[in-house]
Curated annotation (Swiss-Prot):
Self-association and partners: The complex is composed of two ATP-binding proteins (BtuD), two transmembrane proteins (BtuC) and a solute-binding protein (BtuF).
Family annotation (CDD domains): ABC_Iron-Siderophores_B12_Hemin (cd03214)
Gene Ontology MF, one: ATP hydrolysis activity
UniProt enzyme class: translocase
Record flagged with keyword Transport: yes
Identification of the protein by name: Vitamin B12 import ATP-binding protein BtuD
Keywords, alphabetical: ATP-binding, Cell inner membrane, Cell membrane, Membrane, Nucleotide-binding, Translocase, Transport
Function comment: Part of the ABC transporter complex BtuCDF involved in vitamin B12 import. Responsible for energy coupling to the transport system.
Subcellular location: Cell inner membrane
GO cellular component terms given for this protein: plasma membrane
SUPFAM superfamilies linked to this entry: P-loop containing nucleoside triphosphate hydrolases
Gene: btuD
Length: 253
């Protein structure tokens, strides 16, 4: 276990919720808009104060200084664009600033792998202000993964993503989830707020379903994402079908 959250809360946006996160685990927070997903995962970053207690790698999260946190975890908030103009490669280099002198060849190998996975290799010399929304989001994802890539940052343990698929098309989204699974296979725990319930059903190891600031249920995708619980939480009709050995959710008006 790398993280233990007890009675995490920021009333009224988030009421007390407790959960644990293991190394290499992919955890999805799902729920309607305003349910508390972003609030919950933002508190795991150590940048926002609230109620409750978070133990991270055996130590209270509040006891870490920011440079230590920057080496151990990365937090990608919802899409924003800085007010300065730099090339993409320069922006990506900023994600390495907190690391302890990683080897140049290891950094280059990690950069090549991540950029190829997200199909942004041809964007490295572009100015970030000239990128489309989807291109910019992929650059942000690349920077986040680079910061906690184990081969160049052995202290890394946690990647926190707030709605990372925003602005991505279906092919780019598929590539992102493949990269997230690659991170998890290297032992990085990935925590994310997500709206694509079919992706959560397929990709998550653990799910927390939130509504009106409260955790309705938590557990495996099959236990949490029942038709009854989804219909009650999202106030819409839901069907769950099997297609080619895979469960799919269909939402009816």
């Amino acid at each position: 276990m790398i993280l233990d959250a007890k009675n995490l809360a920021m009333p009224p946006r988030l009421l007390p919720v407790s959960f644990t996160i293991d190394a290499g685990e992919i955890v999805h927070f799902i729920g309607p808009n305003g349910s508390g997903k972003s609030t919950a995962i933002s508190m795991l970053s150590g940048l926002f104060e609230g109620q409750g207690e978070i133990t991270f790698m055996g130590q209270l999260l509040s006891d870490y200084d920011l440079p230590s946190l920057a080496r151990m975890r990365c937090y990608l908030s919802q899409q924003d664009r800085p007010a300065f103009s730099v090339a993409v490669y320069h922006y990506l280099a900023l994600s390495l600033s907190a690391l302890n002198n990683p080897r140049v060849d290891h950094v280059q190998h990690a950069l090549d792998e991540i950029c190829q996975a997200l199909n942004i290799t041809d964007k490295l010399n572009r100015n970030i202000q000239t990128l489309s929304g989807g291109e910019w989001q992929r650059v942000r994802l690349a920077a986040a993964c680079l910061q906690v890539w184990p081969a160049i940052n052995p202290e890394a343990t946690l990647l926190i993503l707030d709605e990372p698929a925003a602005a991505l098309d279906i092919g780019q989204e598929a590539a992102m989830y493949k990269l997230i699974r690659r991170m998890a296979e290297q032992g990085i725990a990935v925590v994310m707020a997500n709206h694509d319930l079919n992706r959560t059903l397929r990709e998550a190891d653990k799910v927390l379903l939130l509504n009106n600031g409260s955790c309705v249920v938590k557990g495996s995708p099959s236990d949490v994402m029942t038709v009854e619980q989804l219909e009650s939480t999202f106030a819409t009709q839901v069907q769950r079908i099997e297609h080619e050995g895979r469960s799919c959710l269909i939402f009816n008006d």
